[in-house]
Amino acid sequence: MTALEEARAVRGRVAPIGVIGGSSRVVEHNLYVYRRLWPMFVTGFFEPVFYLLGIGFGIGGLVGTITVGGQHVSYGVFVAPALMASAAMNGAIYDSTFGLFYQLKYAKTYEAMLATPVTVGSVSLGAVAWAVLRGSLYSAVFLVVMALLRLLHSPLGILMLPAAILTGFTFASLGTAAATFVRSWDDFDLMNLILLPLFLFSATFFPITIYPGALQIVVELSPLYRAIDLMRSLGLGQPSWSMVPDVAYLLALSGLGLWVTSRRMMKRLRP
């Protein structure tokens, strides 16, 4: 009997610690790992800030003001909430895809965890929770930068942080679900092919109204567009009932991603 099999035999005689307790152990494991890899973690803070400085102020100097909901705002104020949503997406999606795939296929981290009272459900939720935490930290730092650059147009802008957490939750759930289908590193080329158009065409840099009517419907199916619409409404101080379907859509995709993740992880990890 191997050491892993012996550990599983012992595990069978130990009471599970619960899904929430187990998922917190998964998050704790990632925190421990990134104590040594903190430069890799910190570099993720800079990308959205560079976009904000380069596009928000660079191109913004050429564009000037833009009209949104009857308000005239600077281009930097317009684009900043969208870049914050993108920061939440990127922070969550890359850890929940590349990181999860590596731990599933090569490091066998989750198999080792299952030799303890941690369950498959805990592993799935913990992987998502860690990705959400990372995306949320990126968003929080970005929000501070927005405040320092005086790009917070309304006191409601502070509510962009919980909206960013929801965005991270959505993309972390979808990312972990997608990662369970990945067979090799080459498959991530397809994922990047999806993420780049999402970033460029989800009304990140211009209003959705520039698209023809049929294309607007397609863009509205993008989860990043829903996140941007939600966060831009808050950032510009223009709350409306259109935020309700945005939240509902993101929650629905989060639930779908969690369900697929749980099913796939159960299939791959259950001994």
Stretches found by the model and what they are:
Residues 1-158, 162-271:
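Hydrophobic transmembrane alpha-helices and immediately adjacent juxtamembrane helices
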